[in-house]
């Protein structure tokens, strides 16, 4: 996430520290408080800084102002925060909302797979990783996670065999 933040505006600005980026986002957000994009960027900044509560506040604002067809962006960010907080059922609900809004976006499917892995619901995770690959066949992290889960399930099955 830090790299994503630092790459924002890299064509217009020299390499900047996280604090400089955060300050720049805050100044622009003061001028345009209804920008869901800026609120989402601010949430990303707070996630990088480890301030989940502040990130959620920014995402609430982003959800309020985002057009319906773009609400998956702040929703999937919120799902990741909930996932990291081990609020997996909430993360599933929010990530599912993101998939319903943007079913063509592979990252939404991948996020659901990640949450199901955390819940140790490996079969459900496989379904979501496979749907990720249907949307984006070269998505290497999804391929790697499928292999890892399949290996885990085979080992688990082997332990149960008489």
PLM ranges: what are they?
Residues 27-28, 61-65, 97-98, 131-132:
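Canonical positions in the second alpha-helix
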Residues 33, 67-69, 103, 137:
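Short coil turns that delineate tetratricopeptide repeat
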Residues 36-37, 70-73, 106-107, 140-141:
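Helix-start (N-cap) detector for alpha-helical repeat units in TPR-like alpha-solenoids
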Residues 44-45, 80-81, 114-115, 148:
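Residue-level recognition of tetratricopeptide repeat
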């Amino acid at each position: 996430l830090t790299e994503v933040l630092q790459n924002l505006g890299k064509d217009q600005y020299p390499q900047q520290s996280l604090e400089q980026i955060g300050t720049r986002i805050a100044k622009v957000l003061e001028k345009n408080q209804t920008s869901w994009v800026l609120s989402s960027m601010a949430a990303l900044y707070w996630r990088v800084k480890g301030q989940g509560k502040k990130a959620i506040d920014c995402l609430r604002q982003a959800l309020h102002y985002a057009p319906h067809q773009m609400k998956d962006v702040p929703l999937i960010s919120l799902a990741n925060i909930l996932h990291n907080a081990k609020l997996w059922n909430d993360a599933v609900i929010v990530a599912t909302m993101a998939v319903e809004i943007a079913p063509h976006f592979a990252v939404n499917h991948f996020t659901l797979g990640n949450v199901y892995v955390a819940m140790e619901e490996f079969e459900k995770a496989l379904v979501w990783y496979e749907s990720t690959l249907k949307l984006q066949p070269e998505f290497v992290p999804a391929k790697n996670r499928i292999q890892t889960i399949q290996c885990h399930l085979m080992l688990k099955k082997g332990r149960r065999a008489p």
